[in-house]
């Protein structure tokens, strides 16, 4: 999903102090009073209802944002009859000598088909970049960058649309009435109305609010006709210089046209290009018309129901369609006196270039059955002055050509006037004038006083990341021991010990690897996931973090390297792996258990959980035991030849952290990682399950292994996915995106239960559940370890001496003594079960272990405390981020004076683990969604955030970590 909150510039839109301005068509009243909330409303409307657009922002006269967005999971909601359309497509392909469409592999689900006026697209090639509308955007961006250099541009926000059709209707109905029908209301919440920021498009019309601006073809004409060099990335026809054009007397007295068979109509009655071809074939003495490419995609006009293709055999019986004509260059077109500028799907964007050729332009009005649409220059050009008008059905075209022949001198004058207009009114300066008139009139009429913007959650998150990174412990380099690195079991204490060794500058050799990641990923690895290692062995450990540049969003981490690990995708590509259903189910259970812990602790959403972000590792433990989320325990049995799982973290990972207090400020709860724009969709416990199941379904569809689809279907059933949704998801071209109706609403716990049931793990003895056996009564190998022990052992080489040093250090520092039951459960395993477990295994340290246990209070002796935690009053959730709420509704009320964001993590982690908490009335009821709970608290925290209170007087230095230097030396 496009990251609106990452892209939007949150600087204030200043008061307008420029000159008066207006545009002939006027400014739509729905733009009046727009602000930051309107910016979100318009962006989300285009993204959800129209698929794609570009966010554009000017501040201080400079272009600060030009960000394209494209919804990969766009749902059209048009109710298209896919069977009929594909039958038409097959017929068109047959007429062209091709085979039918492969409906199983090449066709997207019908609600994913993309629309563009009368046309639709069913295939998977829908993410257009430079090869699609990307070059068109490149041209517009180049002109806007020139605009900032040559004119005084006011502060403004708008959405740019470079597709053929306008997108925003004045009456609150759907665009593309050919597809949706007239009067089809927009879905919620956009049906409620509210101000919008301007949408600027290549054309508009009386029923649309879009403001027409110079098209990419017009801009290409302006560049080349003024001697400027076309921007790189554009593939446009150049306007020839006036000196290279033939004299009027040397031109042929024929009307000329070359172009493809675009247009909404399918016959000579409603398609101007087909009608012109028919006239040319019957009257070659009047016109030279050729279709350079036969576009037979299904299309629709308002004249008839249902889609159609261009009717064959309209031009004779030799072939269904005439042979394609050879394209002509502008110089060749200029060899004719009369140029036909015909509609395609929309008005012809080539008009400015056609006028510049010195020929008289014959310009028809709209074709039958198509909407009335106008270009930005419609009010500038005058019929019989700059061009010769023709009826939309071309019924008077022959008479117009004959008139031109009879009035050659008059035609020459019109051609000269049109050429002058194209070079001046429609040239470079004329186009910049149009942009300035549009932007100034919008500011003057809609928001002359400007408007403030809330602080960007992304910028807040980035600043919090910097605070976290500079707070990580710093150590001076200590000479590395000459002895080899000890070999110790992988457990919480060992991993933390190697992290300490890395911070001392010691090279961990093959046990670690340097990775370049986003700064947010590095912070989460260190502050969230490292702290969960004692609870689950299925998260990858990070030994150290460094930032290469304080201004950069990148970071360098020293990550754990697991011997023999491969991605789950690589493992499944093995010819036998797809058939290992029981082990695959076991791996997915392990991943789900890691999700449970990460969601409870920090509301974690990995965002891109897939077969590529899961590592499978050889040599598992004989059994793995976890809490089941309801106070009991859940176990898995593995064989020596099986694989166990480790989850890695990608750039889409996000979680909530408690930001350090400083300068007397309270802690702050902030999202680290990509900011979710639809919190009601992506901030739920099932999102990562949807991502993973989607990846498995899409991978299995392309696998040649017979067992792949059967196993993928079983996994999907375990996740509660319905069969039609399985089939549709398998055909998707892009990774899973959050949506109103998710692929499944199963969270990790429900997914585990489904896997156990679907793969009969309990019946085979591979899994078991003990509802009455609290996890506190189970000693798990990965909970063990004293962090100082690996370092001391490496230094001394003697186990007893290393343990003695550890015990001495432990006894000097009293264990944590939490004040509440939730806090006790939060620290119980991190202290007592790690320290106590290792001390208990050595009889000589029994007295020390007993001493530590006496210092620690048991949960039963503590008050529930945080069970009375109540969230502040938060405004009703909006369709989108809290950032989009109007300023008048942004204050959620004061946080309780005792509120500490870290207690929320205590509370959710204690859920289901036997904690004596008031689960019914606490901040999160038993069995509720921990991700949503964290999201609600973060929203309240975000709305209470005061940017001034977190401004640093001096930037903190970010120094290069010793462990990174050591690894690079190695």
From Swiss-Prot:
Pfam family, one: Glyco_transf_90
Domain of life: Viruses
Keywords: Kinase, Transferase
Comp. bias intervals (Basic and acidic residues): 953-970
GO molecular function, a single term: kinase activity
Ranges where the record places region Disordered: 942-970
Name by which UniProt lists this protein: Uncharacterized protein 027R
Taxonomic path: Viruses, Varidnaviria, Bamfordvirae, Nucleocytoviricota, Megaviricetes
């Amino acid at each position: 999903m496009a990251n609106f909150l990452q892209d939007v510039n949150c600087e204030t839109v200043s008061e307008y102090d420029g000159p008066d301005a207006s545009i002939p068509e006027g400014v739509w009243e729905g733009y009046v009073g727009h602000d930051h909330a309107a910016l979100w409303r318009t962006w989300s409307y285009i993204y959800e209802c129209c698929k794609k657009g570009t966010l554009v922002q000017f501040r201080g006269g400079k272009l600060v944002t030009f960000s394209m967005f494209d919804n990969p999971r766009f749902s059209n909601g048009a109710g298209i009859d896919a069977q009929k359309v594909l039958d038409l497509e097959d017929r068109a392909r047959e007429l062209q000598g091709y085979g039918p469409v492969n409906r199983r592999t090449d066709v997207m689900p019908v609600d994913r088909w993309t629309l563009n006026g009368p046309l639709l697209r069913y295939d998977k090639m829908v993410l257009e970049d430079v090869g699609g509308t990307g070059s068109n955007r490149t041209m517009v961006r180049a002109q806007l960058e020139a605009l900032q250099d040559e004119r005084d541009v006011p502060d403004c926000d708008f959405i740019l649309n470079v597709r053929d059709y306008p997108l925003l209707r004045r009456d609150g109905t759907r665009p593309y009435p050919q597809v949706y029908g007239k009067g089809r209301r927009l879905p919620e919440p956009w049906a409620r109305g509210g101000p919008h920021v301007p949408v600027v498009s290549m054309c508009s019309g009386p029923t649309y609010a879009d403001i027409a601006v110079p098209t990419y073809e017009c801009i290409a004409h302006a560049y080349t006709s003024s001697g400027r060099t076309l921007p790189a990335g554009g593939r446009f026809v150049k306007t020839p210089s006036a000196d290279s054009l033939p004299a009027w007397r040397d031109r042929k007295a024929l009307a000329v046209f070359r172009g493809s068979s675009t247009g909404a109509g399918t016959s000579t009655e409603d398609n101007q290009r087909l009608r012109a071809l028919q006239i040319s074939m019957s009257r070659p003495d009047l016109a030279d018309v050729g279709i350079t490419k036969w576009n037979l995609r299904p299309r629709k006009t308002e004249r008839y129901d249902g889609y159609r293709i261009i009717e064959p055999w309209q031009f004779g019986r030799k072939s269904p369609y005439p042979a394609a004509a050879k394209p002509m260059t502008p110089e060749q077109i200029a060899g004719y006196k009369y140029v036909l500028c015909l509609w395609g799907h929309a008005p012809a964007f080539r008009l400015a270039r056609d006028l510049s050729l010195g020929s008289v332009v014959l310009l028809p009005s709209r074709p039958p059955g198509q909407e009335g649409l106008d270009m930005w220059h419609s009010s500038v050009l005058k019929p019989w002055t700059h061009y010769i008008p023709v009826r939309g059905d071309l019924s008077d075209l022959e008479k117009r050509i004959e008139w031109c022949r009879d009035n050659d001198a008059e035609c020459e004058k019109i051609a000269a006037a049109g050429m002058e207009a194209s070079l001046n009114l429609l040239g470079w300066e004329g186009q910049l004038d149009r942009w300035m008139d549009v932007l100034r009139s919008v500011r003057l009429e809609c928001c002359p006083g400007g408007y403030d913007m809330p602080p960007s959650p992304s910028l807040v998150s980035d600043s919090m990341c910097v605070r976290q990174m500079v707070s990580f412990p710093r150590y001076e380099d200590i000479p590395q021991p000459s002895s080899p690195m000890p070999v110790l079991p992988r457990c919480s204490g060992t991993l933390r010990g190697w992290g300490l060794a890395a911070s001392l500058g010691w090279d961990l050799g093959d046990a670690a690897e340097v990775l370049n990641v986003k700064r947010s990923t590095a912070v989460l690895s260190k502050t969230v996931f490292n702290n969960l290692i004692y609870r689950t062995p299925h998260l990858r450990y990070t030994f150290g973090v460094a930032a290469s540049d304080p201004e950069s969003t990148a970071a360098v981490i020293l990550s754990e390297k697991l011997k023999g690990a491969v991605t789950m995708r690589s493992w499944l590509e093995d010819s036998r792996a797809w058939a290992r259903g029981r082990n695959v189910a076991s791996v997915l259970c392990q991943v789900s258990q890691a999700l449970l812990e990460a969601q409870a602790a920090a509301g974690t959403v990995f965002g891109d959980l897939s077969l590529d972000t899961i590592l499978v590792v050889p040599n598992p433990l004989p059994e793995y035991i976890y809490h089941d989320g309801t106070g009991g325990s859940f176990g898995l049995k593995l064989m020596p030849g099986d694989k166990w799982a480790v989850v890695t973290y990608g750039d889409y990972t996000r979680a909530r952290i408690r930001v350090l207090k400083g300068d007397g400020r309270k802690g702050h709860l902030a999202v680290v990682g990509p900011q979710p724009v639809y919190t009601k969709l992506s901030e739920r416990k099932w999102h990562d399950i949807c991502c993973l199941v989607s990846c498995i379904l899409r991978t299995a569809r392309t696998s040649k292994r017979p067992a792949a689809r059967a196993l993928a279907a079983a996994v999907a059933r375990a996740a509660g996915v319905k069969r039609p949704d399985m089939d549709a998801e398998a055909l998707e071209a892009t990774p899973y995106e959050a949506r109103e109706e998710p692929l499944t609403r199963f969270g990790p716990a429900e997914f585990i239960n489904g896997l156990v049931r679907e793969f009969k793990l309990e019946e085979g003895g591979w899994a078991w559940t003990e509802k009455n056996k609290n996890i506190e009564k189970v000693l798990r190998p990965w909970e063990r370890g004293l962090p100082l022990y690996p370092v001391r052992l490496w230094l001394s080489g003697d186990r007893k001496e290393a343990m003695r040093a550890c015990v001495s250090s432990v006894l000097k520092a009293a264990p944590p003594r939490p004040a509440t039951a939730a806090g006790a459960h939060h620290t119980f395993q991190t202290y007592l079960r790690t320290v106590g477990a290792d001390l208990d295994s050595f009889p000589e340290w029994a007295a020390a272990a007993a001493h530590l246990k006496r210092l620690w209070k048991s949960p039963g002796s503590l008050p529930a405390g945080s069970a009375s935690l109540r969230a502040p009053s938060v405004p009703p959730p909006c369709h989108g981020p809290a950032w989009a709420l109007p300023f008048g509704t942004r204050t959620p009320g004061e946080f309780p004076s005792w509120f500490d964001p870290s207690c929320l993590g205590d509370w959710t982690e204690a859920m289901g683990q036997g904690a004596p908490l008031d689960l019914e009335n606490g901040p999160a009821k038993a069995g509720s969604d921990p991700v949503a709970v964290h999201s609600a608290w973060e929203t309240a925290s975000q709305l209470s955030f005061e940017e001034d209170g977190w401004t640093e007087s001096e930037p903190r230095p970010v120094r290069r970590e010793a462990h990174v230097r050591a690894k690079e030396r190695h």
